[in-house]
Amino acid sequence: MELEESGIREECGVFGCIASGDWPTQLDVPHVITLGLVGLQHRGQESAGIVTSDGSSVPKFRVHKGMGLVNHVFTEDNLKKLYVSNLGIGHTRYATTGKCELENCQPFVVETLHGKIAVAHNGELVNAARLRKKLLRHGIGLSTSSDSEMITQLLAYTPPQEQDDTPDWVARIKNLMKEAPAAYSLVIMHRDVIYAVRDPYGNRPLCIGRLMPVSDINDKEKKSSETEGWVVSSESCSFLSIGARYCHEVKPGEIVEISRHGVRTLDIIPRSNGDPVAFCIFEYVYFARPDSMFEDQMVYTVRYRCGQQLAVEAPVEADLVSTVPESATPAALGYATKCGLPYVEVLCKNRYVGRTFIQPNMRLRQLGVAKKFGVLSDNFKGKRIVLIDDSIVRGNTISPIIKLLKESGAKEVHIRVASPPIKHPCFMGINIPTKEELIANKPEFEYLAEYLGANSVVYLSVEGLVSSVQQEIKFKKQKVKKRDITIQENGNGLEYFEKTGHCTACLTGQYPVDLEW
């Protein structure tokens, strides 16, 4: 998200909650949001923030933000600052080195002519530089280097056609989506509603859940008419711990209004020139938690299929299959099942060391590798290991692991990667470094096995990855359900053919939209 940095990029989690029925509510909104953010902690570990509101005609926004993990930022004393509240939004953030500052923590809050709004954003604007200049030309100051603040200011900026006494927030959101085609998922809070917005390409994930009465949580067959509230989240994995039931994804280009009365679709903004959907395929490969649902399929299942496809494409004579824990475990199980080899653990993980890929400093990454793994040498001494990893970005993690395994008695170590080589940076919200830093673009890639110290290295093909992701997704005509609501019938794509599509730009260099740099 940081405009001046051309290397590592952000990956964040957004969350929102609103109580149903009469207000003031008995629902503990700040705690629900906190638990939701804990469920999204893997999407960002450097800062977190929550903004709550009582939802009155002149609402008071209560804000708390801080650096660090969610549980460190939101102590019981800090949560007291967020009461009394009937709705709120939250954010957990990853940022670049030098930009990990409190001023860049989200959600952002701005005062507008028609009251305050709060915005939390996951993604990165592909035309951020141009939009920044536009705001500055109109005399709108920006206090941070984050394009999330730009989104907030663009929403606050009154469109020329809007009258002072008739704010039209849907028109403002549509204007933003026209100005910025990608990439973002947003939660926007104004007075007594939350808007959930996904860019027309659907590049970043967003879904909606229903807070159930405690007595109904574990009864999936029971169709309770009671609803304690509604939640919106980057991933569905955050729902179980708060007693929410997954409802549906926010569609690409969809603007959803969530109020105490329910959920309704206000509009769907189409993509230009009939472009396909471009959901980030790397969410399946690495970023998402395995129990999350995208496109009506579980991430774990897709990773398992990737492992099976990898076994077809890259078999090898070996004694056992193992994994670099933990995100590659489903792929390793799929590989082992397909080739008929036992799955055996060879590494144990220190769960209190952060993921090396999303720590923004090279030295922190390398130290993380050294502290992150222990070896279970009794399981593999004298044996040939097929070690499955989900991705190799720089090669900083896998090389020390191979050395560690061989020094601990492994006869051979064959690396199989359950995704294709990453060759291009992502400019749409994922932490992928510059082309020069990527191992796939270095001269050493021609002799990668020797360079890493492995006996062999083979990646899953792009075709194999896409096939594994898409094979269970149904291609069919979809009608946007009215979901107990009224949809504005404006001929704007509310009934359309929605074929699946995935962004593979980091693998192929084919970006779904033109980049403005």
From Swiss-Prot:
Instruction: Write down the species.
Output: Rattus norvegicus (Rat)
Q: Where is the Glutamine amidotransferase type-2 domain?
A: 12-261
Q: Pfam families given for it? A: GATase_6 (PF13522)
Q: Provide the tissue specificity.
A: Expressed at a high level in brain, heart, liver and stomach.
* Keyword list, A-Z: 4Fe-4S, Acetylation, Allosteric enzyme, Glutamine amidotransferase, Glycosyltransferase, Iron, Iron-sulfur, Magnesium, Metal-binding, Purine biosynthesis, Transferase
Residues holding Mg(2+): S327, D389, D390
Q: What is the protein name for this chain?
A: Amidophosphoribosyltransferase
Identify the catalytic residues.
C12 (nucleophile)
* Residue ranges listed under propeptide: 1-11
Per the UniProt record, which EC number(s) apply here? 2.4.2.14
Q: According to its UniProt record, which cofactors does this protein need?
A: Mg(2+); [4Fe-4S] cluster
